[in-house]
């Protein structure tokens, strides 16, 4: 096995192709990575490179918008929308007792893209609200939804 300072790269190609023994092998690698490193990269996942690239480009385009445009999509009570720099503080540490600083991260949170007449949206079910989409970013929604669907498909194949 690798040193704990290296982030493991798990190649799913054989597993996704259904090769004999691949399930047991990738399970062992995943278990090691999760228990000993805490992080891992996935390769051989079958998500088209052009979709990954288009998604990164869509993200760059969103984050390049003026702050006012992004704040018009401020994260709501469903945790859907934009969270600007300094909008959150990590409180996860049970050991650190010093002053906590705000996170220097900006993020745009989305959920499964549900239609406006979906029962969870109509009934305002917590964390199941409608996504907030920026205006004027051609292809942003389509690219983002395609990527989320690809990731969901990958996740389901790994269950």
What is the predicted role of each segment?
Residues 1-159:
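Peripheral, non-catalytic segments flanking oxidoreductase cores
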């Amino acid at each position: 096995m690798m040193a704990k300072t290296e982030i493991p790269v798990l190649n799913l190609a054989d597993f996704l192709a259904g090769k004999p023994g691949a399930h047991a092998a990738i399970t062992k690698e995943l278990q090691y990575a999760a228990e000993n490193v805490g992080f891992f990269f996935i390769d051989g996942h079958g998500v088209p490179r052009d979709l990954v690239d288009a998604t990164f480009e869509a993200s760059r385009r969103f984050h390049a918008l003026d702050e006012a445009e992004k704040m018009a999509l401020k994260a709501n009570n469903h945790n859907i929308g934009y969270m600007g720099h300094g909008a959150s503080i990590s409180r996860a540490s049970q050991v650190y007792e010093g002053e906590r600083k705000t996170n220097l991260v900006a993020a745009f949170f989305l959920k499964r893209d549900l239609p406006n007449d979906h029962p969870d949206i109509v009934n305002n079910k917590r964390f199941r609200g409608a996504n907030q989409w920026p205006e004027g970013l051609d292809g942003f929604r389509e690219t983002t939804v395609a990527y989320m669907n690809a990731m969901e498909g990958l996740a389901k194949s790994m269950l």
